[in-house]
Design a protein with these regions (language model features):
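Helix-to-loop junction immediately C-terminal to a conserved catalytic motif
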Residues: 392
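Transmembrane helix-loop-helix hairpins at lipid-water interfaces of multipass membrane proteins
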Residues: 24-77, 155-188, 262-269, 273-282, ...
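ABC-fold ATPase nucleotide-binding domain signature/coupling loops
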Residues: 121, 460-490, 494-512, 587-588
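Cytosolic ends of transmembrane helices, especially the final helix of ABC transmembrane type-1 domains
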Residues: 223, 267, 288-324
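Membrane-integrated ABC transporters
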Residues: 1-37, 60-62, 81, 85, ...
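An intracellular "coupling" helix at the cytosolic face of ABC transporter transmembrane type-1 domains
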Residues: 18-21, 125-138, 190-197, 207-210, ...
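Extended non-transmembrane interhelical loops and adjacent amphipathic helices
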Residues: 1-10, 90-136, 198-241, 313-324
Length: 589
């Protein structure tokens, strides 16, 4: 929902007061200095001219030196604030980024994973991180804008005595400038989504080239020229967007120059005419000329910063829209106790990511009884992982429903339900923390014995690693460098910890052993089925021999369940399962 400019300003000031109130103090001082410095520059020349024309005296000289001393003090204070302001902004950014990260971790997984969610997050992240746009940009505009308003009021009070027409011209031209800035801002707003999409593509490519796997592939497959060409293409698109934005700013600058020239011409003609008519003295002329220049600068600052504030408000809306994003309504019923067992039913479940997309799953009907061992097999893209994510509550069915012990999953508290699930996905990552924390997270220090048992269970005890060893060498010089198979064993130890020593009642292994050979995978699955005795299990695999001992095997094909049954039943069908099984078996003969 789009918030007004004033609403966004109040929101940012309240949040900034919470995270780094020294910024608010700095803004108040900057506002004061922003008024006093230009006004002092108006009165000082007039005072000097008046002193000379009227004869020097001690009072006049003292007044001049007092103003000069005052200017020295406030300029020194301004320089100090400028040096410290960057530190204050950094503290403020950390507060807003913390809000953003917390929100991302709580939002629906399906939204975060979608292109829409990724673009919204990228926009919000950059609006917080950038020094010149978003939050920091809005804060940098507030003080000169308020200073301009105060300065305009003071200068109008002086200039009214000269000619009311001059004041009217200043105000009228300011409204023209505001209108032009509004039109240009509307055009710049249209560029926001293309810029965010471009940034996401560029960040992905840069991340790929700097990552370990990308670095290997670029060298092995001689991808340097091709990758560079793609990056240059994305950069070229970004430059074109920047040129378009700069073009809009150029038109605004041209409008500034024309309005400023017209405004000052009218004011100077009025002042000179007043001198010719003998209405003002020379020192007053100097003061009025200074006031005209000062007022014109204040008006330009006001209209320019008001336009910038409008642009910054658009960026703040991006942040607030992400932070205000609501999840799908979550049920309040508690799931069954882990000792009760889980019976999960999928009734005519279909799923697609967006309305305009093709269905990934179509009319899936499946029952997983308590304590049953289920295997899901099929080729890549058959819908296996999507089906698992629906069972986990990460996705909601587009059509149909999921029942847990005969209760609609939409009526169950999803966080409580997910505590009953121990999962290992094929794309799980390690955290830049210790080995123990990667297995037990916050319980690492209080569960040392249990962690060691899980490490032994997965075979990691052979590595002689310490529990407090960091597992990311890129972030810690003393860190470990686990191989692909070792990384998967750490993930499996994490699953074993939740399954054996915490609340898990359902084990889901979604091809987490892809870095292992077929024999090692078979042994691991058998061991996990043993420790999951009395619990429901779902195993997802390409390799048929790893899952042929399960109670039920379903074969996915193009988003549908093509076949189901035990291993022997499926072999007798002489269908898709048998063809895949015999083909894979031939590889090991």
């Amino acid at each position: 929902m789009k918030k007004s400019m004033l609403n966004n300003v109040i929101y940012i000031l309240k949040k900034t007061w919470k995270y780094e109130r020294r910024i608010i103090y700095s803004l108040l001082i900057q506002i004061t200095l922003g008024v006093l410095l230009p006004i002092s520059g108006v009165f000082l020349p007039a005072l000097v001219v008046g002193s000379i024309s009227g004869g020097l005296n001690c009072g006049m000289v003292a007044g001049v030196f007092a103003i000069l001393l005052f200017l020295l003090v406030i300029n020194t204070l301004s320089a100090y604030l400028s040096n410290m302001y960057g530190t204050y902004l950094l503290n403020n950014k950390i507060g807003f980024l913390s809000d953003l990260f917390r929100k991302k971790m709580k939002l629906d997984y399906s939204y975060i994973e979608s292109p829409e969610g990724q673009t919204a997050y990228e926009n919000a992240f950059m609006s917080i991180l950038n020094d010149y746009t978003g939050i920091s940009g809005m804060l940098s505009v507030i003080s000169p804008l308020i200073s301009s308003v105060i300065g305009i009021c003071i200068n109008i009070g002086i200039m009214v005595r000269l000619n009311i027409l001059v004041v009217a011209v200043l105000i009228f031209t300011s409204f023209i400038h505001i209108f032009i800035a509004y039109l240009i801002r509307a055009e710049q707003e249209k560029l926001q989504e293309p810029v965010a999409d471009n940034s996401r593509r560029l960040n992905y490519l840069f991340g790929y080239t700097s990552g370990q796997s990308g670095a290997r592939e670029i060298r092995i497959f001689d991808m340097y020229g091709w990758i560079r060409q793609n990056i240059e293409g994305v950069i070229k698109d970004r430059i074109n967007l920047a040129k378009k934005s700069a073009g809009y700013k150029l038109w605004l600058s041209i409008a500034d120059c024309v309005i400023l020239a017209f405004r000052e011409a009218v004011a100077y003609i009025a002042a000179i005419s007043a001198v010719e008519r003998g209405e003002i003295e020379v020192w007053e002329l100097v003061m009025y000329l200074g006031t005209i220049t000062c007022a014109s600068a204040f008006f330009s600052s006001f209209t320019g910063n008001l336009a910038l504030l409008g642009q910054r408000s658009i960026e703040i809306n991006v942040i607030r829209n992400f932070l205000d994003k609501e999840n799908n309504e979550c049920g309040k019923k508690l799931p069954p106790d882990k000792d009760t067992g889980l019976k999960i039913e999928l009734k005519d479940v279909s799923f697609k990511f967006r309305k305009e997309d093709e269905y990934v799953l179509r009319h899936v009907n499946l029952t997983i009884n308590a304590n049953q061992k289920l295997a899901i097999v099929g080729e890549n893209g058959a819908g296996k992982s999507t089906l698992v994510k629906i069972i986990c509550g990460l996705y909601r069915p587009t059509e149909g429903k999921v029942l847990v012990n005969d209760v609609d999953l939409n009526e169950i508290n999803i966080q409580a339900y997910q505590k009953l699930i121990a999962t290992a996905f094929q794309d799980t990552y390690l955290l830049p923390m210790t080995l123990g924390e990667n297995i037990a997270f916050k319980d690492a220090d209080s569960s040392i014995g249990e962690i060691k048992e899980c490490i032994s269970f997965t075979g990691l005890d052979k590595e002689k690693w310490e529990l407090n060893s960091p597992v990311t060498k890129m972030l810690d010089a003393d860190g470990l460098v686990p191989s692909g198979g070792q990384m998967q064993k750490i993930i499996l130890a994490r699953v074993a910890f939740k399954l054996l020593f915490r609340s898990a009642a359902l084990l889901i292994l979604d091809e987490p052993t892809s870095a292992m050979d077929a024999i090692a995978e078979k042994e691991f699955y058998d061991r996990y089925l043993d420790i999951a005795s009395g619990k429901s299990c779902i195993l997802v695999s390409h390799r048929m021999k790893s899952t042929n001992t399960c109670d039920l095997i379903v074969v996915m094909d193009n988003g549908n369940i093509a076949e189901r049954g035990t291993h022997s039943e499926l072999m007798q069908l002489n269908g898709l399962y048998r063809n895949m099984y015999e083909l894979q078996s031939s590889y090991y003969q």
